[in-house]
A protein has these predicted regions:
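Short His/Asp/Glu-rich catalytic/ion-coordination signatures at enzyme active sites or charged loops
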Residues: 108-120
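PAPS-dependent sulfotransferase catalytic domain
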Residues: 1-93, 97-110
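C-terminal accessory extensions appended to soluble enzyme cores
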Residues: 119-142
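Amphipathic alpha-helical recognition patches that constitute DNA-binding helices
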Residues: 66, 115, 123
Length: 142
């Protein structure tokens, strides 16, 4: 987590282990001076988008393992919806690449898929299932 992230101080100086950080990320911080809800509540405002015809869901794994094809599909989706690119397709793809540069993200850690398996304990898995409900299903992961 970048030191400019709003919750950096808490994660870096109050929480002392990866286990505590994962638990806090799942449960949120109801007492925090800066809003930080549980994992389900953080996703809830966006779940309705999945029901919209004009929305193209994109998962992190596709951006990592099939980046070029995924970015091309995103452009195809925009154009199919009537959007006219103001530049060449190649330039638009370059713009997309810059926009998803992980080094510019305050929450970027490693940029690899499946790493959660290395850190989630059985307790984390159970807690995540309890708090998130059907979130993984709605996002297409189960």
């Amino acid at each position: 987590m970048a030191n400019t992230h709003v919750h950096h101080e808490y994660y870096a100086h109050v929480l002392s282990s990866m286990e505590e950080r994962i638990t806090t990320s799942i449960l949120g911080r109801p007492d925090a001076p800066i809003e930080f809800p549980d994992i389900r509540a953080r996703f809830e405002p966006y779940l309705g988008w999945l029901e919209q015809d004009f929305v193209m869901p994109v998962c992190f794994e596709d951006l990592i393992h099939n980046r070029q094809r995924t970015l091309e599909r995103m452009l195809d989706h925009l154009e199919a919806g009537g959007y006219r690119l103001p530049t060449s397709r190649e330039r638009a793809l370059e713009t997309f690449e810059r926009a998803i540069d992980p080094t510019r993200s305050p929450t970027f850690r490693e940029g690899k898929t499946g790493a959660w398996r290395e850190h989630f304990t059985a307790e984390h898995r159970a807690l995540f299932a309890q708090v998130s409900g059907d979130l993984l299903q709605r996002l297409g992961y189960e």
